[in-house]
């Protein structure tokens, strides 16, 4: 593991324990929660996201927000902490399901709609016009995906393929992109040859295009290119905190 990643994981744990909202842990929590939720249509701003993480409240002058956006933002903070708590565990179906539970257990709308929380989907769903795995096939396809992944020498290409296949299966009723991107961050933290990154909302179109390229042509070039771009951005942001 690189010196940078050892430093990063250590700072995450120390700053979380101290409730430090001024370091790289808080930056990563806010940046990842904001961007990953924004990609999925969240209306919350970076300022609102920071206020929720720092204080558990929205700015006093805010007169509009969607309850679901707030609930999912808080759920994302919890999912990130669960990810940190399980870094030494193997990536399994149960671990992924628990990530989904942390993200979605407090979302009223999903519960009211009867969505499975912390479990695979019970109803078919689509990505635009693309048909994803049927509910009856999800468990088999997820097992095959994880079995394949654990046999591979880890690289950005393998990680991109894993992510694209995961999103094509779309194992949950909702929250697939956010759990998938959290898995990306996790696997980059724990694998020696990978570097962590956050997919930014400003690059949403490139990201969607990369997933589409894999679905249609089984190619990962666009996703890998984007991931390498985001690696540089995240490292640049983290360097600011390395001088304390």
Question: What are these model-predicted stretches?
Answer:
Residues 1-244:
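FIC/Doc superfamily catalytic core
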């Amino acid at each position: 593991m690189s010196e940078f990643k050892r430093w990063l994981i250590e700072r995450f744990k120390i700053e979380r324990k101290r409730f430090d909202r001024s370091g790289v842990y808080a930056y990563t929590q806010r940046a990842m929660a904001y961007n990953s939720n924004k990609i999925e249509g969240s209306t919350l701003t970076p300022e609102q996201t920071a206020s929720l993480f720092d204080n558990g409240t929205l700015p006093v002058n805010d007169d509009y927000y969607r309850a679901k956006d707030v609930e999912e933002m808080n759920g994302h903070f919890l999912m990130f902490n669960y990810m940190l708590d399980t870094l030494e565990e193997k990536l399994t179906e149960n671990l992924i399901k628990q990530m989904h539970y942390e993200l979605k257990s407090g979302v009223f709308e999903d519960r009211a709609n009867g969505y499975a929380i912390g479990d695979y989907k019970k109803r078919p769903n689509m990505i635009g016009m693309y048909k994803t795995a049927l509910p009856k096939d999800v468990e088999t396809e997820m097992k095959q995906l994880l079995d394949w992944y654990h046999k591979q020498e880890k690289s950005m290409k393998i990680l991109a393929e894993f992510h694209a296949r995961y999103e094509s299966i779309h194992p949950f009723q909702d929250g697939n992109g956010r759990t998938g991107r959290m898995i990306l961050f996790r696997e980059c933290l724990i694998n020696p040859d990978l570097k962590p990154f956050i997919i930014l909302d400003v690059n949403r179109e490139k990201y969607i295009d990369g997933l589409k390229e894999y679905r249609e042509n089984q190619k990962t070039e666009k996703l890998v290119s984007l991931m390498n771009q985001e690696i540089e951005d995240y490292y640049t942001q983290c360097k600011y905190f390395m001088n304390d």
